[in-house]
Each structure stands twice: as structure tokens, then as C-alpha cells.
A protein has these predicted regions:
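Short amphipathic
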Residues: 11, 30-36, 165-175
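Glycine/alanine-rich phosphate-binding loops at beta-alpha junctions
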Residues: 4-5, 12-52
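Rieske [2Fe-2S] iron-sulfur-binding domain
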Residues: 38-141, 151
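C-terminal catalytic domain of Rieske-type non-heme iron oxygenases
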Residues: 58-60, 70, 129, 134-231
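Glycine-rich, flexible loop/turn motifs
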Residues: 4, 8, 75, 100-103, ...
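A structural signal for well-ordered alpha-helical scaffolds and beta->alpha junctions
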Residues: 15-19, 121, 147, 178
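Generic structural signal for secondary-structure transition and capping sites
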Residues: 27-30, 77, 190
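Short, contiguous pre-domain boundary segments
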Residues: 1-11, 162-163
Length: 231
């Protein structure tokens, strides 16, 4: 009963412990890139995921698509800074090389070292999942993936045929607790006051937010007679 609902205690928005505890949510499935981005380069560092998980990663396409750690297993040097096309990785610090699937290949001056290399010398390989050309990765493979919900709502769109246009990319840095921003995104009460043009295009009384395991869906209903599609 929504009449009995309450907002979170304010400490969740300003206490450091609460903020750090909330970061576990970031280890779930995150969108990385679209298949069309491999048309120009087969290696892509994914900065937007690093910014929220703290883990530098790179998506590479060889015989298959992998999500690898973007940090050399020797002294922690970043391996890839820009999208590029290569058949292997070579660390610019000490020359350690890795195959395109992240396996250790060679290290100068380490010939004859006993017990070397080991599995620890390979790059970490994180789980990946693909839906209709959209590639996702996770640091917690037990996180639920709501593919059934996504497919039932968006399956009619041929997203795999879409082509990424980097000119349309936008980055925004917001000085706020992430929960404040998500709260704002998930509620529509502010639309008539903050977004008057959007309010004219939407049937505000029909604004819907649906939650399900692993995801949330918002539906803004167009005015009668406007171009629209069904979700």
C-alpha cells in the first residue's frame, strides 16, 4: 500500500558507511558497448564502468568477445587507453605481453624463472552477456539478468542492427550521491515543474514506474494522437 510508504532515512544519502555499502549494487550487470563498435576497432576500454566500479576493464573481440582487466599483472600499468585494433596486448612499462583473450604470453628477462608463469599472470576475465547486440559485463555473476522482462518489452526493436554514433555520446559529472540522482530519475512528480515541455508531451496522470528483479521500467504515455509505440 503506497499510502504507508516512507522515504529512506536521510543518513543513506550522506553517511560514508552507507555510501560505501551501497556500492555493492554496482558490481551487478552493466552495459558496456554495442556490437557495431567492433566494426572500427576490436579493443575498447570501458571508462564509464571503471568510474562506478573502480575496476579498469577492456572489451576485446578475438574468436569471441571477452571482458578483461585493463591492468597489467606485473606492476599494475594500464594497458589500453584508447579504442584500437590489435592481436595482442603489450605493457609499455616492462614489455609483458598477453594474447587477445588475456592469457599471459611473454615477459622479457624472465626466462628460467621457476613456477612462472602461473594462472595469476593472466588478465582477469569478467563474465559477459549479450542481448540483441548489447554487451553487458558484471563483477558479480550471480546478479539476476532480467532478459525476459527486457525481451517482452523491447523485443520488437531490431537493436542489433543499430549503429553506434560516437558524436552523440554524452558524459555528465554530477556532484551528488548516486542515490539522489536515481531517486530523481525514478519519480515523475517533478515533471510539471522542472520539465514543462515534457509535461506537454506526456499524459502526466498515466506516468508509470514498474519494478522487477534486476531492473526498473518507466512508461510515459504520449498524448492521444501522438506518434508512439507500446511497451
Amino acid at each position: 500500500d503506497i499510502r504507508k510508504s516512507r522515504t529512506l532515512p536521510s543518513k543513506f544519502y550522506y553517511e560514508e558507511k552507507a555510501f560505501n555499502d551501497s556500492k555493492t549494487a554496482f558490481k551487478g550487470w552493466q552495459f558496456a558497448l554495442h556490437s557495431s563498435q567492433f566494426q572500427s576497432n576490436n579493443i575498447h576500454p570501458i571508462e564509464h564502468i571503471e568510474s562506478i566500479t573502480g575496476e579498469p576493464i577492456v572489451i576485446v573481440k578475438g574468436e569471441q568477445v571477452n571482458c578483461l582487466s585493463n591492468i597489467c599483472t606485473h606492476r599494475g600499468m594500464r594497458l589500453i587507453d584508447q579504442p584500437c585494433s590489435k592481436n595482442s596486448f603489450r605493457c609499455e612499462y616492462h614489455g609483458r605481453t598477453f594474447s587477445i583473450d588475456g592469457k599471459f604470453r611473454n615477459m622479457p628477462e624472465f626466462e628460467g624463472v621457476i613456477g612462472f608463469p602461473s594462472d595469476d599472470d593472466n588478465l582477469l576475465n569478467f563474465p559477459m552477456a549479450v542481448w540483441d547486440g548489447l554487451h553487458f559485463t558484471s563483477q558479480d555473476p550471480t546478479s539476476p539478468i532480467p532478459w525476459a522482462e527486457v525481451e517482452s518489452r523491447l523485443g520488437f526493436l531490431d537493436i542489433e542492427s543499430y549503429v553506434h554514433d560516437p558524436a552523440r555520446d554524452r558524459d555528465h559529472s554530477i556532484s551528488a550521491n548516486w542515490m539522489l540522482y536515481v531517486d530523481n530519475y525514478l519519480e515523475g512528480f517533478h515533471i510539471p515543474f522542472v520539465h514543462p515541455e515534457l509535461n506537454q508531451a506526456l499524459d502526466y496522470s498515466g506516468y508509470i514506474t514498474e519494478t522487477f528483479e534486476g531492473g526498473v521500467l518507466q512508461i510515459g504515455k504520449a498524448m492521444e494522437g501522438d506518434v508512439k509505440f507500446a511497451l
